[in-house]
Curated annotation (Swiss-Prot):
Stored NCBIfam families: PRK00596.1 (NF001861), rpsJ_bact (TIGR01049)
Gene Ontology cellular-component annotations: ribonucleoprotein complex; ribosome
Organism, as annotated: Listeria welshimeri serovar 6b (strain ATCC 35897 / DSM 20650 / CCUG 15529 / CIP 8149 / NCTC 11857 / SLCC 5334 / V8)
GO molecular function, one term: structural constituent of ribosome
Biological processes per GO annotation: translation
Entry keywords, A to Z: Ribonucleoprotein, Ribosomal protein
UniProt record similarity statement: Belongs to the universal ribosomal protein uS10 family.
Source species taxonomy: Bacteria, Bacillati, Bacillota, Bacilli, Bacillales
InterPro entries: Ribosomal_uS10, Ribosomal_uS10_CS, Ribosomal_uS10_dom, Ribosomal_uS10_dom_sf
Role: Involved in the binding of tRNA to the ribosomes.
Subunit structure: Part of the 30S ribosomal subunit.
Disulfide bonds: none
Name assigned to this protein: Small ribosomal subunit protein uS10
Family matches, as PROSITE patterns: RIBOSOMAL_S10 (PS00361)
Length: 102
């Protein structure tokens, strides 16, 4: 019999909110009787934007901004129907993007 697996990818700009959400998911899955591997930290994406400080000229004067996207991966192996139901009801912060693959 093939093992069922739920793979959850979390993305957020703030790593503290991301870690709290991952901890909530792991705790909920373990409480409902599924085995969990993770949260596994994935590489952080860093987007750098360069902007001219002056409006018209002075191209040598620039300012750089960066956005960091932190990611985590959680695998839930052999989930029960109770696990899926409790994960559907879980309330997570608004700054976290969730991708779920079955």
């Amino acid at each position: 019999m093939a093992k069922q697996k739920i793979r959850i990818r979390l993305k957020a700009y703030d790593h503290r909110i991301l870690d709290q959400s991952a901890e909530k998911i792991v705790e909920t899955a373990k409480r409902s009787g599924a085995s969990v591997s993770g949260p596994i930290p994935l590489p952080t994406e860093k987007s750098i934007y360069t902007v001219l400080r002056a409006v018209h000229k002075y191209k040598d004067s620039r300012e750089q901004f960066e956005m960091r996207t932190h990611k985590r991966l959680i695998d839930i192996v052999n989930p029960t129907p109770q696990t899926v139901d409790s994960l559907m009801r879980l309330d997570l912060p608004s700054g976290v993007d969730i991708e779920i693959k079955l």
